[in-house]
């Protein structure tokens, strides 16, 4: 089911509870991190939450501090019924386009679940191309706690990856900007040229190939 415009504010468990009453038992929230950066992968996460959990402060990962995301990360993994992480590389972003690479990362995250989901709650307006019942939610990471949990996992995993990549390519400062197009990052690309982590089709990179 495709939703183009958000409805009025409801409980952040409204969709999960409604679907549970309809008989769904493995409702996976899905979100991604890293569509916009000039470098690094797109990371997606799928999270199946239990009926009862305790994750204070859980919300859209972009609206909470890095410190709280790091605190929530192990709590979500511990309390979730299931979760999976999927990546699409910078080369796949270039070869497919960023939307298709994002959907690929989401499919890979779902493939990493121990048991298949029976319903998907997807952040955004583009369904995952799988034969599963699903609902897209614009601004879903602030409207569904399952999506919010996936948002946190995806963001933390991607930030940690970019910090690791900083050790391989320290001249670009990936640990600080995480691959986004900061002034310092753009200046480094102009000075040094792109590295293998950069997205060659993105403006701000392709000019220096």
Swiss-Prot record:
**What does the note under cofactor report?**
Manganese or magnesium. Binds 1 divalent metal ion per monomer in the absence of substrate. May bind a second metal ion after substrate binding.
Q: Which UniProt keywords apply?
A: Cytoplasm, Endonuclease, Hydrolase, Manganese, Metal-binding, Nuclease
Q: Which residues bind a divalent metal cation?
A: 31-32, 123
**Biological process (GO), any one:** mismatch repair
Q: Name one GO molecular function term.
A: RNA-DNA hybrid ribonuclease activity
User: What subcellular compartments does it reside in?
Assistant: Cytoplasm
Q: By its UniProt entry, which HAMAP family does this protein fall under?
A: RNase_HII_B (MF_00052_B)
Family designation:
Belongs to the RNase HII family.
Q: What is this protein called?
A: Ribonuclease HII
- Origin organism is Syntrophotalea carbinolica (strain DSM 2380 / NBRC 103641 / GraBd1) (Pelobacter carbinolicus)
């Amino acid at each position: 089911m495709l939703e183009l415009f958000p409805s009025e504010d409801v409980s952040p468990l409204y969709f999960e509870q409604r679907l549970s009453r309809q008989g769904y038992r493995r409702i996976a929230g899905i979100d991604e991190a890293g569509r916009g950066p000039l470098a690094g992968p797109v990371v997606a996460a799928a999270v199946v939450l239990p009926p009862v959990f305790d994750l204070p402060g859980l919300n859209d990962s972009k609206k909470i501090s890095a410190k709280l995301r790091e605190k929530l990360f192990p709590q979500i993994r511990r309390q979730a019924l299931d979760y999976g992480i999927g990546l699409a590389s910078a080369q796949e972003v270039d070869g497919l386009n960023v939307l298709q690479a994002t959907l690929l990362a989401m499919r890979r995250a779902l493939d990493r679940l121990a048991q298949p989901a029976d319903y998907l709650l997807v952040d955004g307006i583009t369904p995952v191309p799988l034969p599963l019942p699903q609902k897209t939610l614009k601004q879903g990471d602030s409207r569904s706690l399952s999506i919010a949990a996936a948002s946190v996992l995806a963001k933390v995993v991607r930030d940690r990856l970019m910090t690791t990549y900083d050790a391989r390519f320290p001249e670009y400062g990936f640990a600080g900007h995480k691959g986004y197009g900061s002034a310092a990052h753009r200046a480094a690309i102009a000075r040094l040229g792109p590295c293998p982590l950069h997205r060659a089709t993105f403006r701000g990179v392709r000019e220096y190939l």
